Amino acid sequence: MKLTMLGTANSAMVPVYGCDCSVCGAAREDSNLRREKSSAYLEHNGKFLLLDANAPDLMCRFPAGLIDKILLTHYHMDHVHSLFDLRWGAGDKISVISPDDPLGCDDLYKHPGILDFSLRAQAFKSFDWQGITITPLPLNHSKLCLGYCFEFDGKRLAYLTDTVGLPKQTERWLKEFPVDWLITDCNYSPIEDPQARASLNHNDFHHILDIDETCRPTNLGLIHVSHHMLGWAEQHPQAFSERLRILNDGEEITL
């Protein structure tokens, strides 16, 4: 199975509109440094499973018939907005598997078009896609949110966004079933103020170190990064390693 990162930034993307910091300036000059909103796709047996649906070129990148299913982490707009265009397509239905959020996002449930929202993922209740076992894992976020662990041929990859820390039951699961890759959001550089940390809705780098120590993944990849986090990373290269690093748009992980 192969996972490809469609985007690795937070909702502001990189470069941030109107920002003249060094990270955003470099991204304007070099398109390879640009980052779209975090999402990915899994490729296996010639089929494609989208993880969230926010890529600006989604319908061009995946022509009709190429998307087998869509797997949503949650219904915040920055993770689903491409569905609002995709739903008005023609042809076969596309199944969208999502957390059992009764509100969804705006009028997607009311006017689904070619999208089928009838399948709901439940925490720790595994299901199969193309021979890959997918286990939904609860996350800590302001909207009902699930990460997903993909297992094939003895290898595991966990895609866990959006979250601030991990629920205890998810930590226990990841300790019982160690993963080769854990991919999660790191929106913030280390925040020292306890009050500020208590109000977070995404991981800071302290959370990443805690997750690493508790869950002990073989590799830990960071996504949903802000331009501030990227600037901090440039100034603190010693905080990263070959096994703990920020992922890039277009990066592929094959297991």
Model-derived features with residue positions:
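Glycine/Thr-rich phosphate-binding loops of Rossmann-like dinucleotide-binding domains
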Residues: 13, 59, 80-81, 106, ...
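Conserved beta-strand hairpin/beta-sheet module of binuclear metal-dependent hydrolase folds
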Residues: 1-61, 145-161, 181
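Metallo-beta-lactamase
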Residues: 93-146, 151-153, 244-253
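Short amphipathic alpha-helix with an adjacent loop that forms part of the alpha/beta core around
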Residues: 60-64, 127-130, 170-176, 255
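Active-site metal-binding motif and surrounding structural segment of the metallo-beta-lactamase
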Residues: 46-97, 178-180
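Divalent metal-coordination and catalytic microenvironments
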Residues: 3, 74, 134, 148, ...
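Active-site metal-binding loops of divalent metal-dependent hydrolases
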Residues: 8-9, 53-55, 75, 139-141, ...
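Cap/insert and terminal regions of metallo-dependent hydrolase folds
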Residues: 165-254
